[in-house]
């Protein structure tokens, strides 16, 4: 069963490689890192309101004071 699964996945990759030449694939996988998402949505500056570490530009939210450090 494992061999069949590996062969199937290899065939899918080869088919995709033949269908879409390098750099011309229509639907790229969405890869969003925390840094990239901050560029699009902005981040909370120091002493601003936060709930999570990822809300802050510094990546540190003081949870009981509810502000970015």
Swiss-Prot record:
InterPro entries the record matches: Conotoxin
Domain of life, per lineage: Eukaryota
Domain remark from Swiss-Prot or TrEMBL: The presence of a 'disulfide through disulfide knot' structurally defines this protein as a knottin. The cysteine framework is VI/VII (C-C-CC-C-C).
Tissue localization of expression: Expressed by the venom duct.
Family statement: Belongs to the conotoxin O1 superfamily.
Prodomain residues: 18-40
Gene Ontology CC: extracellular region
Keywords in alphabetical order: Disulfide bond, Knottin, Secreted, Signal, Toxin
Pfam families on file: Conotoxin
Compartments, record wording: Secreted
Name by which UniProt lists this protein: Conotoxin LvVIC
Disulfide bonds: 43-57, 50-61, 56-68
GO molecular function: ion channel inhibitor activity; toxin activity
Signal peptide: 1-17
Keyword check for Signal: yes
């Amino acid at each position: 069963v494992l061999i069949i699964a590996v062969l199937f996945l290899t065939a899918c990759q080869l088919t995709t490689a033949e269908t879409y030449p390098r750099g011309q694939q229509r639907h790229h996988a969405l890869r969003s890192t925390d840094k990239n998402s901050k560029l699009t949505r902005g981040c909370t500056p120091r002493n601003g309101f936060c709930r999570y570490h990822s809300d802050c530009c510094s990546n540190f939210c003081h949870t009981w004071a509810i502000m970015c450090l």
